[in-house]
Amino acid sequence: MTAHDRRVAVLMGGWTSEAAVSRVSASFCSKAARLAGWDSVEVELNRNVLDKLDDIQPDRVFNALHGQIGEDGSVQGLLNILNIPYTHSGVLASATAMDKISSRLIFSSVGINVPPLLSLQEDTYVQPADYTGDYVVKPRNDGSSVGVVIVKEGMPAPQRSQWAANTQLIAEEYITGRELTVSVLDGRALCVTEIHVPGQFYDFDAKYKVGGSQHTVPADVPEEVTELSCGWAERAFAILGCRGVARADFIWDEDEDQLYMLEINTQPGMTATSLTPEQAAFCGISGEELVNHLLEIAQCDE
């Protein structure tokens, strides 16, 4: 690649609930790209994005978007049409990973344990049918723990009005345990991190606010849990056809010695508090090296 082929557009923002976080990721990635010798330009995702890309004429796109549009295959499809190589996963892997029902069916089919889904009743309130234990309600297609509600036994069911009318919801059994995560780079697991949060779970604030969570790298868990987490993360990455980097999230019920995969995130956070850059650094890969590598292997769907 010559110096004339090193212009990169870092896509960020948009209009979803995760737009602000995306801009922080973009700042981190754009700076890293410049340090690696790329001519980096941050581009806001809006109705004028095609004109902006036409003006810039990038040789690569670094996808720093989070949530719907940027993570569900939509932007990936646009970049395929424009024939601009982009980082991270393609259309099918992105769309499938974002859909919590489709992805879990696939994970289960290859021997990955996932929390049981519950039949959901929606009216004024949202609650599972014929189930009285603790449960979780969450959007079917969203990330960064946006819109997640935990309902403990004896608590009132959440009102449907808490979510937008067009938001598809799912419910699952609430499983307590230790929160683990594994980043996968080029199909190989980096390491296991344990996440310690002051609240009930690893929510939006815990993920992105400084001091919102504490991380233990590598996680102090039995070797067999480390091996299983890494193995399942690599298996999920492969079966969905992911590219570049992704991050798989788990709950380990230590009392029952059961591991559950919650999801695989094809657009993991790339901020100062994010898990994937932290795991890469633990493995000797700097933020600059990680971003540069993702740009070097950027591609469109074949």
Model-derived regions, located:
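ATP-binding N-terminal substructure of ATP-dependent carboxylate-amine bond-forming enzymes
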Residues: 1-92, 96-98, 102, 109, ...
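Hydrophobic beta-strand scaffold residues
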Residues: 40, 85-86, 114, 135, ...
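Short beta-strand-to-turn element immediately C-terminal to the catalytic PLP-Schiff-base lysine
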Residues: 118-120, 148-154, 184-186, 253, ...
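Phosphate-binding site of ATP-dependent enzymes
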Residues: 153-231, 259-260
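A long amphipathic alpha-helix within ATP-dependent nucleotide-binding catalytic cores
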Residues: 164-168, 210-255, 289, 294-298
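Conserved metal-phosphate-binding beta-hairpin within the catalytic cores
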Residues: 173, 237-270, 280
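C-terminal active-site "lid" helix and adjoining low-complexity regulatory extension at the edge
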Residues: 258-302
